[in-house]
Amino acid sequence: MKLVFLSHVSDCAGGAQRCLLDLLRGLKHIHPDWQLYMVLPGPGDLLDACSPYIDGYRFLQMEWWLVGKDMDIGTREKLSYIRKLSKYSIKLTRYLRRIKPDYGMTNTVVFPHLAISCKMLGIKHCWFIHEIPDVTWLNLNPVFEFRFIFRAIDKLSNKILVTSRYAEFHYQKVMTSAKISSITQAVELPMTVGVDVKCDRHTRYTILLVGAFDSNKGQMELLQAVKRICLL
């Protein structure tokens, strides 16, 4: 089996990148004979972290179809984006022809290049969406209307993965429901050592959540799960 993954950034700081790293690590552990490839904008610590698990990579600069709030988006800008999208999708197609993957996975909602290239070559494609841009990214505007972007994601995907039940319910309204599944534990947590499993149950626990917060990330689902555990 050959799989190719597309990342929108080259650093390893964000949750989407951590999900991708853990996915590559897990796949290589379970299926050491599989060949895994990456496409990303350029060198960085994401490639350094993923290198032990991949068999090849390609650098390719791709423009997002989400831009800053202060940028005007007219017909001229849309046509310019379409030209660049076509140019770099064709470049990506050449790379796919060379590695001949069985499946492609886009690890972001911000551009469709891999999905389009897979469609052109008849390769199955999965979209792993970590964001709800029309709800949680209020500082960005889409080059095209969100309904067009969501329709494109739906048409260009065999499967759509999201990171929370909230995101699953949201995208089921705008995409084919049967294609969408949520992954509620996407990032590996380090094993806790030195815990006394025989300790008495406490009546109150304090949980500290650190990081970026929005409905898509599943923090509420975490708290609900902890509450259910405490009631056992």
What residues fall within each predicted segment?
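A conserved mid-protein helix/loop that constitutes part of the nucleotide-sugar donor-binding site
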Residues: 14-25, 205, 212-228
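Carbohydrate-associated surface elements
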Residues: 166, 186
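An aromatic- and histidine-rich active-site surface loop
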Residues: 85, 89, 103-123
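Conserved donor-binding loops in enzymes that form glycosidic bonds
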Residues: 8-10, 109, 185, 209-215
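A short beta-strand/loop micro-motif in the catalytic core of glycosyltransferases
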Residues: 104, 154-165
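Nucleotide-sugar donor phosphate/pyrophosphate-binding loop at the beta->alpha transition
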Residues: 86-88, 124, 133-156, 189
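N-terminal strand-loop element at the rim of the active site
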Residues: 7-14, 26, 30-79, 167-170
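Nucleotide-sugar donor-binding and catalytic loop/hinge architecture
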Residues: 1-2, 193-206, 230-232
